[in-house]
Structure formats: C-alpha cells, structure tokens
Amino acid sequence: MSVVNSIRAQIPPIHREGYPFIGAFALATLVLFLIWAPLGWIGTVLTIWCLLFFRDPVRVTPVREGLVVAPADGRVSMVVQIIPPPALGLGDKPLPRVSIFMSVFNCHVNRSPVAGRVERIIYSPGKFINAELDKASEDNERNSLVISTPAGQIGVVQIAGLVARRIVAFVREGQPLAAGERFGLIRFGSRLDVYLPEGAKPLVSEGQTAIAGETVLADFSLGDGGRTYRAD
C-alpha cells in the first residue's frame, strides 16, 4: 500500500449533508484571507472543525438478535425508568431510557440501535433549550422513530439542542433497518433518547462514552449465542 493510500485509509469519509457547510466555510475562509491573514487562519480552523463534525467513519456493529447498540456518539447522560412520550405509542408504563448527549465535537451521524422495521415517524416542533436537561425530551424540537423488532418496539428520539437547529432523517415509515444502519443526523450538538422494551436492563451507566453502532446499550436476547459483526 502506498503512503497516499495509507493516509487516505486513516481519514474518515464525510457525510454528504456536510458538503454545503464545508463549501461555505471554505469560501468564507478564502475571503477572510484576502481581508486579513489572521482572520483566514481562524476560518481555516473552523473549516477543519466542520470537516470533523460531518465525518462518517465506518463502524463495526455486533449483529445478534436482542442486542441494542448506541444510535449516536457521545456521553451517556441519563439512564432512567420513565413513561415514554404519548406520541410514541409505547404505553403509559415506565420504560428504560438511555440518553446520549452529543457535543459539537462528536460525529453526528445517527445509526439504528436495532434491526427492525420503522413503524412510525413523528416530528414534534418545539424549543431549543439545553438538550442535557430532562425536560428537553418533551419541550424541544424532536423527531421520533418507533422500530418494531421480534423482541418488541424500540423508541428512538432525535432531540435538538441549544446549537442544533436542524434534524435530518433519511428513512421512511415501513422501511427495514439493519442494526447500525444510518438513519439520520442532527446538526451541531444534540441528544438521542432510546426507549427500551419493558424488562430490558441497560448495560451502560451515566458518564460512559458511547460509540454509534458499536457500544451495546442492552441485551434482551433469550439465547446465549456468540456475536457476529458487520462493518458499515
């Protein structure tokens, strides 16, 4: 393998949603250099940050019935038992919920936590308060998916935050999803909530770092078979 190919192998691909932003940052940087060189270097740093924000690295997802993987990169901010939002249609009993907070430095491509079929997609307009606050799950703008699996229904909620003002979903109702498959993106900092079926036990704790498509949040499989893995 050549040196160039070795370098390319270490650079993650960029998601297409980022192209307009990266182009705008690069153009602004060029203008800033023409105005005053120090401003141009500031623009260069911001352009590099924009590239990193929209990175879309390959992830190796454990594939086995009953596994629930993280839908987002970030920090596990909450692991609680709570009644899910009525819009999800998951009942009125408390369910395990794992919340992952994404900072502006995390990769923001969202991945399906399970293999299943998208039953419902519910968009809810709202505010843009700090996504780390518990009330953000009901007050903020959000996009919710309900995914049907053999083990029950999983709720996945993309929540906008103080900086995030745009939720993007790539899927439609009735569409099948593989575990770890890309389903959306939130621009510039936000939160993902995962509502697990009743009785499921989360395997992560608050403060833990999660990697989308790889970190196992829960395992409600009845079998003891070994895991296999799929790269995407």
Curated annotation (Swiss-Prot):
EC number of the protein: 4.1.1.65
Residues the UniProt record annotates as site (Cleavage (non-hydrolytic)): 189-190
Compartment annotation: Cell membrane
Posttranslational modification: Is synthesized initially as an inactive proenzyme. Formation of the active enzyme involves a self-maturation process in which the active site pyruvoyl group is generated from an internal serine residue via an autocatalytic post-translational modification. Two non-identical subunits are generated from the proenzyme in this reaction, and the pyruvate is formed at the N-terminus of the alpha chain, which is derived from the carboxyl end of the proenzyme.
Modified residues (Pyruvic acid (Ser)): 190
Coiled-coil regions, chain positions: none
Keywords recorded for this protein, A-Z: Cell membrane, Decarboxylase, Lipid biosynthesis, Lipid metabolism, Lyase, Membrane, Phospholipid biosynthesis, Phospholipid metabolism, Pyruvate, Zymogen
Pathway recorded for this protein: Phospholipid metabolism; phosphatidylethanolamine biosynthesis; phosphatidylethanolamine from CDP-diacylglycerol: step 2/2
Cellular component GO terms held in the UniProt record: plasma membrane
Active site per database record: 190 (schiff-base intermediate with substrate)
A biological process from GO: phosphatidylethanolamine biosynthetic process
Mode of membrane association: Peripheral membrane protein
Main location: membrane
Manner of cofactor binding, per the entry note: Binds 1 pyruvoyl group covalently per subunit.
One protein family per Pfam: PS_Dcarbxylase
The protein's required cofactors: pyruvate
Keyword Transport: no
InterPro entries: PS_Dcarbxylase (IPR003817), PSD-A (IPR033175)
Keyword Iron (UniProt): no
HAMAP family from the UniProt entry: PS_decarb_PSD_A
Family to which this protein belongs: Belongs to the phosphatidylserine decarboxylase family. PSD-A subfamily.
The protein's assembly and partners: Heterodimer of a large membrane-associated beta subunit and a small pyruvoyl-containing alpha subunit.
Reported function: Catalyzes the formation of phosphatidylethanolamine (PtdEtn) from phosphatidylserine (PtdSer).
Cross-referenced PANTHER family: ARCHAETIDYLSERINE DECARBOXYLASE PROENZYME-RELATED
Name under which the protein is recorded: Phosphatidylserine decarboxylase proenzyme
Species assigned in the record: Rhodopseudomonas palustris (strain HaA2)
